Each structure stands twice: as C-alpha cells, then as structure tokens.
C-alpha cells in the first residue's frame, strides 16, 4: 500500500469490505439450499435450510400456484397452532400470483390514469391471517414457504471480521470470517407449497 488511491483509504480494506456482500449472498442461499453437517477435521460444519426444519405442513400444488394452495396451507398451520406472516416465493411464482388478479379483463384506463395494470402484490389475505409476500431470487422455483418470522431467523455466532494471514514475501494477506446459524422454533408453525411450476 505504498501508493495512495483517490477516494479509497486502503485498497486492502476496500477489498475486504467487498467480500462481505458475497458472503451475505451465500448465507441467503443457504436458507433455501442448506443441509445439515456436523463437521469434522476435514469437513466444514453446515446448517440446514428452511426445508430441513419445516415439518409436515405441506401442500402439493402440482402446477401453477393457486390461491387455494395458500389457503389450505394456512389452515393446516393454523390448526397446528401457528401464526405465519410471510409467504416466501421465487420471483416467477410471485408474478404468477400477480397474474391471477391482474389480467387484461380487469384493466381499465381513463384520462386520469397514467398507468396500466396493478401495482406489485404486497400481501396475500386468507381466512387465517395476512401473509406478506417476499420474493427471493434464491428461493427454489418449485417451492414456496409460509413461515412465522418470529419463530425463524439467523443467529450470529461470530460477526464478520477481518483476520490477518501469514505473510509470505512482501504481500499482505487476510480473510473475512463470520459464523452464523439458522434457528427455527416450532416446525409446525411453518409450511411449504411444493410442485410449483411457473
């Protein structure tokens, strides 16, 4: 770091800071595709994703998502004592939900309107409560998750931090380290919609 760079205090710190968004994406990906591994001297520890912890509340859609899929799953979860508040789906599934409501037969344009179609869907309302719709690009397109956000989340074991590595030659090396886990309480308070197509 013998050269000063305009707008950058330390190129090394800049590169270390750039690693954190990528690591956060890996954590988000783990929520949907994670598997449990206890770890050993040669195998890294790994935490399971949502599908590992969600219990028996499952609805098999077998095609495009329908409002009845969400309603039936909400009923199952309600009977088991759950009160979910989120519907987490792939963007393609969210578009299909939107298309159930916003079709050309419902579009009306007059002089006071300067847009065509409906805005994005924010909530799915059911007899058993409202679900905030969350689109996530890492969510499998064939699965939707109905979850209680108060009973599911990430736990920080070690926050992200920079650790220096051994010096070789005149180079400076380091790594960004953080350790997180996924907590899910009351597995029957959540559910999945499987077999979705978009």
PLM regions and their residue ranges:
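Alpha-helical scaffold segments that mediate packing/assembly in large oligomeric complexes
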Residues: 1-75, 198
């Amino acid at each position: 770091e013998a050269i000063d760079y305009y707008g950058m205090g330390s190129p090394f710190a800049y590169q270390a800071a750039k690693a954190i968004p990528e690591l956060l994406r890996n954590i988000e990906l783990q929520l949907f595709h994670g598997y449990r591994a206890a770890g050993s001297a040669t195998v890294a520890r790994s935490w399971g994703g949502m599908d590992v912890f969600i219990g028996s509340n499952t609805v098999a859609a077998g095609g495009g998502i329908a409002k009845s899929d969400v309603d039936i799953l909400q009923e199952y979860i309600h009977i088991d004592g759950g009160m979910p508040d989120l519907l987490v789906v792939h963007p393609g599934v969210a578009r299909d939900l939107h298309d159930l409501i916003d079709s050309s037969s419902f579009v009306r344009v007059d002089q006071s309107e300067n847009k065509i179609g409906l805005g994005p869907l924010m909530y799915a309302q059911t007899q058993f409560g409202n679900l905030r719709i969350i689109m996530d690009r890492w969510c499998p397109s064939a699965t939707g998750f109905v979850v209680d956000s108060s009973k599911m989340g990430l736990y920080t074991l070690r926050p992200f931090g920079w650790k220096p590595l051994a010096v070789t030659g005149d180079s400076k090396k380091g790594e960004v380290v953080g350790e997180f886990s996924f907590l899910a309480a009351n597995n029957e308070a959540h559910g999945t919609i499987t077999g979705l197509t978009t």
